[in-house]
Amino acid sequence: MAYKNASSPHQKQRRTTSQVMVLVILCLIPGVFLQSYFFGYANLIQISLACLAALASEAFILKIRNRPVLNTLKDASALLTAILLAISIPPLAPWWIVVIGTIFAIIFVKQIYGGLGQNIFNPAMAGYVLLLISFPVQMTSWLPVQSLQPFSLTLMDQINAIFTGSTLDGYSVAQLSVSIDGLSMATPLNTVRDALHNGFTVTEIFNSVQFKASSWQQIYWINGAFLAGGLILLFKRIVHWHIPMSFLLGIGIFSFIAFAYSPDLNAPPLFHLFSGATMLGAFFILSDPVSASTTVKGRILYALLIAFIVVIIRNVGGYPDAVAFAVLLGNMCVPLIDYYTQPKVYGGRK
């Protein structure tokens, strides 16, 4: 057997928490860039507001708990939570939406449970669910892509819309959510769900004007960008393959079963894989090492469970996308999954 000679030192240095968080944030850049390119720069404003709220709220609660403030803030975990939440909400949502969600995520989901490494729920998704349930109108006011927007929005228009609810010319967010053909803007998942409830088949929906105006091509590109960033995380071994690959495989299998059973009432697997927050969830949310399962078998079961819930809610639930709800339900099951998937210790009794 041939052995490879390598110079010392042979013990590799482990990455620090801050290095891991920063690398994850960097891998989010392709998806964030395409969001800005297709829908405007308002999402960057939301990210800035969320980061400020995250740092301020974490510093506040750390001060109350008599914990070191600067050293904790340097780990960048609060910034990652803020960015994940900010890119999940509509770009022109009121400024207080992202602030409330971020404060809730940092204080009530992360710090009250003991801080980084102790929270049982994913903070960003818990904050998102709080906002979606509490403010459904603001959380579903999506913009058309810039090529279909009836008004040309400058950066100042977007800033003004976020802080006052209207552009410099007086157009409200509701008016901005209507494309040039007069159709109210909705995500592809929204469009498919609403049309199915109205009795249309999947084939009719995909050929409809409403679906073609729902920016589905841009959403596919954005998911592809998050997939590219996720593959970098896999290559760097920041994320193990078990969770993202099992989740995507589960989405494909479960959606294929539903599509094969009733192709007129269920979207095909490719649509599910590249719509909504599928790729963002697979590589950046489910793979959270704190709230996910810790065993190899457990990670696979955890990801498959979430994939199953996502497909079920998308097909028959009341919400178009279900990644956030599915992740929180999966987080609840982690202790049980870990209990029954612990590897047998050599020499131990079964």
From Swiss-Prot:
The gene is rnfD. The chain crosses the membrane at residues 20-40, 44-64, 68-88, 89-109, 125-145, 215-235, 241-261, 267-287, 300-320, 322-342. HAMAP family: RsxD_RnfD. GO terms for biological process: electron transport chain; transmembrane transport. One of its GO terms (cellular component) is plasma membrane. This is Ion-translocating oxidoreductase complex subunit D. Signal peptide: none annotated. Its EC number is 7.-.-.-. It is a multi-pass membrane protein. NCBIfam families: PRK00816.1, rnfD. The modification FMN phosphoryl threonine is found at residue 187. The keyword Chloroplast does not apply. Its cofactor is FMN. The keyword tRNA-binding does not apply. It is an enzyme of class 7 (translocase). Part of a membrane-bound complex that couples electron transfer with translocation of ions across the membrane. It is found in: Cell inner membrane. The complex is composed of six subunits: RnfA, RnfB, RnfC, RnfD, RnfE and RnfG. Belongs to the NqrB/RnfD family. Keywords: Cell inner membrane, Cell membrane, Electron transport, Flavoprotein, FMN, Membrane, Phosphoprotein, Translocase, Transmembrane, Transmembrane helix, Transport.
